[in-house]
Structures are given as structure tokens and as C-alpha cells.
Amino acid sequence: MRMSSASAGEYRPSAVSLSSNGGGQRDAESLFRTKPMSEIRIVESATRKNIEDKKEELRQLVGTRYRDLIDSADSIVHMKSLCESISANISSIHGNIRSLSSSSVAETPKLASLNPVRVNVYGIACRVKYLVDTPENIWGCLDESMFLEAAGRYMRAQHVQQRLIKLEGCGGGVAEVDQSKLLANFPLLEHQWQIVESFKAQISQRSHERLLDPGLGLGAYVDALTAVAVVDELDPEQVLELFLDSRKTWILQKLNACTGEDAGEVVLVFCDVLSVIQVTVGQVGELFLQALTDMPLFYKTILSTPPASQLFGGIPNPEEEVELWKSFRDKLESVMLILDKNDVSKSCLTWLRECGGQIVGKVSGKHLIEAIVTGAELGSAEKLIRETMDSKDVLRGSLDWLKSVFGSEVELPWNRIRELVLGDDLNLWDEIFEKAFVERMKSIIDSKFENLTKAVNVADSVHAYSEITGEKINFQAYLNRPSTGGGVWFIEPNSKKVGLISGNKSSPEESDFQSCLTAYFGPEVSQMRDAVDRRCHSVLEDLLSFFESEKAGPRLKDLAPYVQNKCYDSVSALLADVDKELEFLCAAVKKENKDSEAIPPAIIIEKSLFMGRLLFALLNHSKHVPLILGSPRLWCRETMTAVSDKLSSLLRQPRFSSNTPATADSPGKQLHTDLRKQTSLAVAALLGAEEKTSPKFEELNRTMRDLCIKAHTLWIKWLSDELSAILLRDLRSDDGLSATTPLRGWEETIVKQEQDESQSELKISLPSLPSLYMISFLCRASEEIHRIGGHVLDRSILQKFASSLLEKITIIYEDFLSAREASEPQISEKGVLQILLDLRFAADVLSGGDTSTNVETPKSTINRSAYRRRQDQQKTKLVNRGRIDGVTSQLTQKLDPIDWLTYEPYLWENEKQSYLRHAVLFGFFVQLNRMYTDTAQKLSINIESNIMPCSTVPRFKYLPISAPALSSRSTNKVSIPVTSNDASARNSWKAFTNGEQSQTSDLEENSNFGVAFKSFMQESTLKLGSILTDGQVGIFKDRSAAAMSTFGDILPAQAAGLLSSFTNTRSE
């Protein structure tokens, strides 16, 4: 036997081994012989415990099996009783069925006996049975969604009830039977009728629910409508209203189910509800409009019923019920008149507009269209909605009806339904979506321009900006700061026409130009300008995407002024912030001398220049602000660029294989066709716009220009004050003004005199160069101009700067002369001549700021690289020049009149030559008012001049526009020996700088370089001349002079004449 306990299992091997040796006696004997008593007792106790465990296990096993056996017996007895009961029931059913089959079945039972009492009792019983069977019948109809059948059964039960009530009300009949006593045999009749009457509300409710169940066929909705019309006694107008209200509920359910978080989901909901509207209008036509001679489906359904004799089966002699039913049908037919087409159209139009208001109105407190956040998404949504409107598949349920009406297949079902039902040339898009989409586009424009205002924070940028480190910085350190700008401005963007397929890729020259702009503006200004441009570009892209529609024309008229006004308002707000910061800096400059904790002037100037660069960037190098404010016709370029990108991606797709013919429905061809169609719609609308710039653009340009000048005015005032202080200090420390001997840099001039038929020569010494501090004064001013942008600065800024400097010079010399008259030492004759030359030279160089200039405002174009200025100047003497003349007159009075008459023409000639030699060095000022253009330039004979002589070669006065073409292909190119000539040039320059004089030694050595340079200039300008008109020659000449002026920053004063010969006219 098995042992379940652990102890028994432990000694199992011992027991087995004992039993295997033989009988129990031998085992016991061997055990006593081999084992001690302690182990024998252990084995005994283990064996006894094992025996008890086995007994208990056997006892539990037998008890469980017995209980199972008893339960099984009880189950068997119960099963037997159930089987007997089932058998008895089956036998009873079988007998009943046999008894039913043996009885005669008739619609109206025929009684063998004509006993009136029995006939009346039988008739009443059959009618009561009809009422009793009615609930079950109606339930079955409702379960099968046969609502019209259920309504008919209810109405017939009502007629039977009316018949019974009539019997109950009469006291006797033909057979003198008390009918009331007979009805007393059916006490549940009243209760039964209450049950039947409750089905009226159920039929109506289930029918309404059926109408709210989408996705069913038209027959199901017709059945529900007719059931409601019968039960609730509605006329056709009310039925139409009920049908339209149920569809409105459909639309509300779809709208409320949309979360409004995803634009794609919103567009799909719009398409779904639009499909509901189209299908509903089509079904209204099929249900209520009579087309040709065929009756509408609703009337056909509600008025077509089987004969009344077949509706009251089981009731003997139902003549009165039939009469009641016929009267009911007559009344129904009198009510169910076919609606007039105009009434149906008005109801549908009213319903359609209400649905449209719900679609674009607020749903759960927000507009679903707000989920669409870009103009491109609006355009895509419109495309999908229009595709849904024109889809034939949406109205597939009405195609058979349309075919029966028109006699053939209909290609545009919605257009035909619109003609039949609405009776108006109604466009669903215009009626529902157009206004909402336009308003949403305006909201998108508003939000993006609001983001522009938030993204470009002028105040924070100005407060954080400073290129100067340290608490205090003096003016000399400011002048010695490293230069970061200037030379890049000789590069102009290359504006080439881009092909349609090539896209809008920028050329390397354009990229270089943009990098130069970024280097000049700095990262802060570039980021702010790019932020403005990016957002304006985004707005314009959205707008153009929205214009790719059939409604492009009306949208352009509405949105073009709107976006221009918004752009103007946003940029004006930005400029207002700039103006506010400039006012703050102006106030800070005034407080600088009074407050020890004031902002250092150098930092104030840097911040004002920072705003000046920002305004310059927005005025001249913003691409999309002038594009938006310009004529909408210019927006075509953006449209074509966007389409070219799409076409490029289309062309990069794999083509069809050669053995596969491209069909008209191929995706690639279809996409290409759609793009062309959309582009043509947008471009046609844009080209139809007026070709005029918004007046706000000119106003905005004037504002930016004025603010740019205002920003540089702080720089002009501060720099003029500091430079004039240096000039005054140098002027006061100039001891040469009291010298009686010729000063350094003077030239001897030979004056021929005729006396008594003989000529004598008189040598006079006159200054040929301005004073070093005057040249330094003008050089530092030019260098500062070069630092902040060079010749790209607005002309009016340079004029103001020149005028301010000339005013300061005038004041300095007036005060200086007044002080010298009252103190020692007095100014000598030589000093007077030097001052006269200095004043005349400074007045000529700065004369551009002392003129009245009428500047024609340039017309803004989309290409800022081709920005040209045309000026018609009318120059008149103003106050500064008059004051200079007064100082000059005061100085000449210190000279002997006869001597002054001798000196004057030669002194002014020296000044003219000095002006011409320094024209390149001071080109920023000279370009404002170029003087002495008819004066021949001469080389200086001053022994201290460090100008290297160069071989004189013939050169052209003007660009060779009409000169014979000199092809570079037929001309041998002259190679320039760079190494030898460069070395000789350096040696020559070194000799001059060391004081060695060499007038002619290098002329022959460098003659080859002159010839090569002449050939290069002729060859390189021929192509330029071939593409320039005569009117452009002067512009090019002025620009080249302005560009060459930059080289003056790296040349000494005396070397200015080296390059001036390339930009000034020589007299032959």
C-alpha cells in the first residue's frame, strides 16, 4: 500500500527490504538479531502510522463515492419526471394541432345556425379577438421595421374599437338583444384597448428614430415618414419639415462628434455633411416633387394599400369597419395633396441655409473651421469639398429617379437636382463655405501678423545689443575699433529670369550677396529682417494657395487690400517701437553729461546705428514686405515659383515604361492638369488686378526713410562734435600758421610778367595741399562712413553729415580767428594762405551737404538688387557756404590787396588740383556734388609728393557704347609679368617713402603694365557697353566713382591722385 506521510516514506526502504527476505516471522527474527531496540521501535511506530493512514484514506474514498452515487440516483429520478412531463406536453400539442387541422378555416366563419344571439355574441367575440391580437401584430411589424403596416393595423384596431363602443352605447338591436349585457361578458376589453392605444406613441417614436438612423435606403425612410403621417395626422408640408429636421439632426450629430482638433478630420466632416445635404435635397425631390406624370414616392406609398375587405380578416360582417376605413382613406387623400414646387424649393432653401449656418457656426463653443491653420490647408479643404460636390457617387441613390425624369443617364446629377428641387442656380460652396473660408483666411492673416509683432521685439533687441565692451570708452578708442564693413558693398545681386522648371534656386552670386548682407547687418538685424520676411512670405504663400480656386477674382478684391492693410499695420507697429527707442536714446544723449550713471555715448551711438541698419534692411532688402504692398500682379511670380516646385517634383518621379501607354487618367498627367488649371485660375485673377502699388507702401517707405535718417542723426551729431574737437585742438597747436617761411607741402609757382616789351618771371610760394589735420579730419569722417555702410547709406544721411561737418568747420575757424586777433601770435601771411586753402578745400569736399536737393522717390520694385536712384538736383548757396565766404573775406583783408590779386588765381588753382587728387579718397562726400569736372588734372610737382609716376596712355572719355566692337576672341591677351613688375613697383614705392626722388626712372619699366591695363579695360567694358543704354551711362559712371572711393581708406593723402585719373575726365 502507498504511504502518504513523510515518516512512512522515510522508512519505506527498510520495510520493503524486510518483506523481501521471506515471511513475517523470519523478518521479525532477523530484525531483532540485526537491529538494536531503538531502531526496532522506530520501525514499529512508522509501520503502525502507515497502517492508520491507509485506513483513513480508504474510509474517505468510500464515503465520497457513496455520496456521488446517491446524487446520481436523485438526478436520474428528476430527469425521468421531466421527460414524462415533456412527453405529455408534446402529446397535448399534437392533439391540438390535429383538432385545428380537422376544423374548417374560413375568413368569415359560416354558422350552421342563424340564431341572432349566437351571431351577435360571435361577432363581438371576433372583434375582441382582433383587438387582442393587435399588440402582437404591431410588435411584429415594429420588429421588422414595417412602420406603415403597424400604423395601418393601429388605425384598423381603432375602427374596431369604435364599432364596439357603438354596440355598447345602444340598448337593443333587431333581435332585441341587450348588447351591453353581451359586452359585459368581456370585462378586459377596456384594458385591452388601453394597451393597443399605447402603441400609437411607440409607432411614432420608432418611426422618428428610424428617420434619425443614417445609412438606410430611401424606402425605409419613406415607410417611417408615412407611418408618422398616418399616426400623428400630419399634412405633406409637416412631413417635409419633419424629414428636413431629421436630416438637420444628422448634420448636428456629425458636427458634435468631431473634436475639431485635426484639420483632416474637420474637412472629412465637412464633406460628410455636404453629402447629407445633397442626398437630402435629392430625396426631397424624389419624395415630394411630381416629375412628368409619375406620382411622388411619398404619396404613392401612403396612398397605396390593399382593398379594405382584406384588412379585417376574422371579423364576420365587417361592413361598418370597412366604411370607417374608407372614410379614413378619403380623409387622408384629401389631406395628402401634392406640394407646390415653389413651396418645396423655399423649404429646402431655408433648411439649406440653416444647415450651412450650423456647419460654419460654433459647435461646442468653437468653430470647427478654426482647426485649419494655413491657407494651403484651406485650399486643400476647398478642393476636397468641391470634389465631393461634383462627385456622382454621392448621389448614386437618385440616379434612377433622374434617369426616369430626363429619360437618359445624367452626367452632373447635382446640377439636375438643383434645377428640379431648388429651382435656382444655387452654388453650395458660395451659399455655405465661401464667406466662412474667406473669414478664416483673414483670421489666419491676423494671427500670422500678430506672431510677427511678437517675434520681432525691438525694445529687447536694442537693450541687449552692444558691440562695445567696458563701462566707459573715449572717442579715440571708438575710432580705433576694428572695421567690419564697407568693401562688401561692391557686390550686387544678379537678378536673372528663372525658368518655370528650374524652380527658385539662388545662384552663387546671389548667395554671396546674401552672405555679404548678413555680414554687414550682423546676426541680430539679419534675424529680425528674416523674421519679418518669413512671416510675410508665409502669409503670401497662404494667400496664393487660397487663390487657387474658382473664386480667385472675388477673393483677390476682398483679401488683397486686407492683407496690405494688415502688413502695413504690423510693420508700422514695428516702426513705432523703433521710434520709441530712438526717442529714448535721444533723451539718453542729453542726460549723458548730467548723470554719472548714464549710458556711454559710444554705446548709444552703436544702438542707434543698429536701428539704422534694421531700418535700412527693411527698407531696401526686405523682399516680401514690398511684394505684399505692391501690385497683386507681382504676386504671379510667387505663384509660378510654387507651381514650378510642384512640377519639378512631378518630373523627378519615375516615368512610365516605354511599353506602357500613358492614359488620360494617369496620376501624373492628372496632377499636371490640375496644377495647370489651378495656376491658371490664380494667375488669371492676379493678372486682372490693377497695376498700382498700395499708397500705404509709399507712406511706409517714407516713414522708414525718415526713421533711418533719425537713427543716423545721433551718430552725425556725436561724430561731428568729437571730430570738430580734435580739429580745433590740432588747429590751435599749429605753429606753422605764424611762420613767415613757406610751409611743408608748398609749391613754387612761376608768374610771368610783361614789362617794357620784356618778360620777367616771378616765383611765388603757395600751398598745394590742405593741412594734415584737415585731411585727417575728413579722412576720419570718411572712415566712419565706410565703417557703417559706405556708399549704401542714404544720400540724405551723407548730406546731413557733410552739412554738419561744414558747419562745425565754419564755427571752429570763426572762433579761432576771433581768438587770434586778440592774442599772440598773430597769423602770418603764409598762415592766412594755408587757412584759405584749407577752408576752400573743406567747403568744396563738403559742398554736397550744402545744397538743396529735390530727390525723386524711387518706385519700389520686387527686385531690390536693381534699386536705382535718379536725382534732379537744383543747387543753391545756403548758410554754411555763405559763412565760409565771410571767413574767407575776413582772411583776405589780412593780406595786401595787390598780393592777394596775384595769389588768388594760383591759390584756387592749387585747391582745385588738390580737390581732384583727393576725389577718390573723399569719394563719399565728393559723390554728393562733384565739382571741377572740366578742370584738367595735373601731377603734383611737390618734391615731397609720394605719388608714383605712371605712363600716360590714351583713354576714353565715355563708355564705348557706340564704338566698334573689339572682340576678345580675335585679340591676343596681354600677359602681365606680375613678379617683376610687382617687385619693381614695391621698390619704387619704397624709394618714394624713404625720400628718394625719381621722376622718370620707372616710367619705361612700367610702361608694359600701362598697356596691359588699357587693353584689359577696353576688352572688359565692350560687353558692358553693348548692354547699356545711353541713359545708363551716367548712372554707371557715378556708381563706379562711388565704388572707387573706398580705396581711399587705404591710401595716403598724397596718393589719392593715383586712382583719380580713372574716374575723372581729362582734357585732351
From Swiss-Prot:
Its main location: Golgi. The keyword Membrane applies. Keywords: Golgi apparatus, Membrane, Protein transport, Transport. It is found in: Golgi apparatus membrane. It comes from the Eukaryota. It is a peripheral membrane protein. One of its GO terms (biological process) is protein transport. Residues 1-31 are annotated as: Disordered. Required for normal Golgi function. Belongs to the COG1 family. This is Conserved oligomeric Golgi complex subunit 1. Coiled coil: none annotated. GO terms for cellular component: Golgi membrane; Golgi transport complex; plastid. The keyword Membrane applies. The lineage of its organism: Eukaryota, Viridiplantae, Streptophyta, Embryophyta, Tracheophyta. Component of the conserved oligomeric Golgi complex which is composed of eight different subunits and is required for normal Golgi morphology and localization. Interacts with COG3 and COG8. Pfam families: VPS51_Exo84_N.
